[in-house]
Amino acid sequence: MVPSLSFADGSDAAKINLVKKLYKTDKQGYANGETYSKYAAPEFKNIIKQAYRIIDGIERRTGDTCDMAEHYDQGFGNGDSKISKLKITPLSGNLVQVTFSDGSLKNNLKYDISCTSNRCVINDIINDGRSIRKQYQKIISSKSCD
């Protein structure tokens, strides 16, 4: 599947290429791209790691599961996600909008991506109007998934 792209300058092209890695699909259209933490800015990556240490501890102690997982953060549901109508659009500043369908679900996410010398890193993801970074920070500060 070839995503539709808007006209982009060099920095925007690098941001788009990063997002394309996250939403890569196989021949049937199923998601098999990278997880975003691999491309997270160092501070964001540290926040993710700290939050997952807490999440893992909660799950081991209580058997409860937290509703935080990278595939959910990227707009993928349970199981196999079949991506269609992928559109990647650079917005103003560091934002890149990603829209796609997964079955009957329509997803609209924004990635905060900064680039230096065409090396780009993800600072945050806005999914369903919520900052993923802030959700992880809340887990760290409260030591809970609530």
Give residue spans per PLM region.
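Low-complexity, intrinsically disordered terminal/linker segments enriched in charged
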Residues: L91-G93, T99, S104-K106, D124-D146
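Hydrophobic/aromatic beta-strand elements that line small-molecule binding cavities or substrate pockets
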Residues: L109-C115
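Short, aromatic-enriched amphipathic alpha-helices that serve as compact interaction elements
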Residues: S11-A31
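Surface-exposed, charged secondary-structure patches
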Residues: K45-L105
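Sec/Tat-exported extracytoplasmic proteins
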Residues: Y23-Y30, A40-D56
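N-terminal signal peptide c-region/cleavage motif recognized by signal peptidases
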Residues: P3-L5
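Extracytoplasmic/secreted proteins, especially bacterial periplasmic and envelope-associated proteins
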Residues: A14-K21, Y39, E43, D67
